[in-house]
Design a protein with these regions (language model features):
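Structural signature of FAD isoalloxazine-binding scaffolds in flavoprotein oxidoreductases
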Residues: 1
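C-terminal, non-catalytic "cap/extension" segments appended to globular domains
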Residues: 4-17, 33, 37, 41, ...
């Protein structure tokens, strides 16, 4: 529903600048959700692996943090020493370990569902809406593979993830054209 509302806002934007503003905000949000949360997950994985060999100091944790964040952000972003302790400010690592992947999964899922809706024939869209309502009504009663089956989506296949990531790439391309 959020993507439907967003697409309507973009479609009905009063000007190019308004459209650019909306797209830029959405792209930034999606990149933060997907790239940042995956980097957080990589940090958690590495520090738990390192912890198997013994206790880690805050310096060890900061080294792992900088390694994973630098790898995720690439050479365009330079992280200084002030960024080293940032891991300690993120409550997920303590209160809900290994939860952050859900943000990236959720964002890619929304994008994949939207792409699935967009590629359907007009007369098939009502079936999608019915399936989507069924997904929402099921709540957490179904495994993700069962819940996504009516949409022809399989989160174990790379094509699922590409649907979500390609949508981000498409928005970036649209933004660059503006």
């Amino acid at each position: 529903a959020e993507m439907l509302a967003f697409q309507a806002l973009v479609r009905d934007a009063a000007s190019r600048d308004a459209r650019r503003f909306l797209l830029a905000g959405k792209v930034e949000d999606m990149l933060n959700t997907v790239v940042r949360q995956i980097a957080f997950h990589n940090f958690e994985t590495k520090f738990h692996e390192a912890r198997r060999s013994g206790e880690l100091s805050s310096e060890d944790m900061s080294d792992i943090w900088m390694e994973t964040q630098t790898a995720a952000l690439g050479p365009a972003i330079r992280l200084d020493d002030d960024y080293r302790p940032v891991w300690a400010y993120i409550p997920h690592f303590v209160h809900t370990p290994f939860y952050v992947y859900a943000y990236a999964f959720g964002d890619c899922l929304v994008n994949a569902l939207w792409q699935s809706y967009q590629t359907r024939a007009e007369d098939d869209r009502q079936m999608f809406v019915n399936d989507y309502r069924g997904l929402l009504m099921a709540g957490g009663t179904k495994r993700y593979d069962e819940a996504l089956a009516p949409f022809g989506l399989d989160a174990t296949k790379s094509s699922f993830w590409h649907l979500g990531l390609d949508m981000i790439a498409d928005m970036i391309a649209e933004l660059e054209e503006l």
